[in-house]
Amino acid sequence: MSVVNSIRAQIPPIHREGYPFIGAFALATLVLFLIWAPLGWIGTVLTIWCLLFFRDPVRVTPVREGLVVAPADGRVSMVVQIIPPPALGLGDKPLPRVSIFMSVFNCHVNRSPVAGRVERIIYSPGKFINAELDKASEDNERNSLVISTPAGQIGVVQIAGLVARRIVAFVREGQPLAAGERFGLIRFGSRLDVYLPEGAKPLVSEGQTAIAGETVLADFSLGDGGRTYRAD
């Protein structure tokens, strides 16, 4: 393998949603250099940050019935038992919920936590308060998916935050999803909530770092078979 190919192998691909932003940052940087060189270097740093924000690295997802993987990169901010939002249609009993907070430095491509079929997609307009606050799950703008699996229904909620003002979903109702498959993106900092079926036990704790498509949040499989893995 050549040196160039070795370098390319270490650079993650960029998601297409980022192209307009990266182009705008690069153009602004060029203008800033023409105005005053120090401003141009500031623009260069911001352009590099924009590239990193929209990175879309390959992830190796454990594939086995009953596994629930993280839908987002970030920090596990909450692991609680709570009644899910009525819009999800998951009942009125408390369910395990794992919340992952994404900072502006995390990769923001969202991945399906399970293999299943998208039953419902519910968009809810709202505010843009700090996504780390518990009330953000009901007050903020959000996009919710309900995914049907053999083990029950999983709720996945993309929540906008103080900086995030745009939720993007790539899927439609009735569409099948593989575990770890890309389903959306939130621009510039936000939160993902995962509502697990009743009785499921989360395997992560608050403060833990999660990697989308790889970190196992829960395992409600009845079998003891070994895991296999799929790269995407």
UniProtKB/Swiss-Prot annotation:
Source organism superkingdom: Bacteria
Membrane topology category: Peripheral membrane protein
Cofactor: pyruvate
Designated name of the protein: Phosphatidylserine decarboxylase proenzyme
InterPro entries for the chain: PS_Dcarbxylase, PSD-A
GO molecular-function terms, A-Z: phosphatidylserine decarboxylase activity
Originating gene: psd
PTM-bearing positions, type Pyruvic acid (Ser): 190
GO terms for cellular component: plasma membrane
Subunit structure: Heterodimer of a large membrane-associated beta subunit and a small pyruvoyl-containing alpha subunit.
Keyword Disulfide bond among UniProt keywords: no
Major localization class: membrane
Signal peptide annotation: none
EC class (word): lyase
Cofactor note: Binds 1 pyruvoyl group covalently per subunit.
Function: Catalyzes the formation of phosphatidylethanolamine (PtdEtn) from phosphatidylserine (PtdSer).
Catalytic activity: a 1,2-diacyl-sn-glycero-3-phospho-L-serine + H(+) = a 1,2-diacyl-sn-glycero-3-phosphoethanolamine + CO2
Location in or out of the cell: Cell membrane
Residues the record marks as site: Cleavage (non-hydrolytic): 189-190
Pfam families: PS_Dcarbxylase
Active site, per annotation: 190
Family membership noted in the UniProt record: Belongs to the phosphatidylserine decarboxylase family. PSD-A subfamily.
Record PTM text: Is synthesized initially as an inactive proenzyme. Formation of the active enzyme involves a self-maturation process in which the active site pyruvoyl group is generated from an internal serine residue via an autocatalytic post-translational modification. Two non-identical subunits are generated from the proenzyme in this reaction, and the pyruvate is formed at the N-terminus of the alpha chain, which is derived from the carboxyl end of the proenzyme.
Keyword terms, alphabetized: Cell membrane, Decarboxylase, Lipid biosynthesis, Lipid metabolism, Lyase, Membrane, Phospholipid biosynthesis, Phospholipid metabolism, Pyruvate, Zymogen
Keyword Glycosyltransferase assigned: no
EC number of this enzyme: 4.1.1.65
Pathway noted in the entry: Phospholipid metabolism; phosphatidylethanolamine biosynthesis; phosphatidylethanolamine from CDP-diacylglycerol: step 2/2
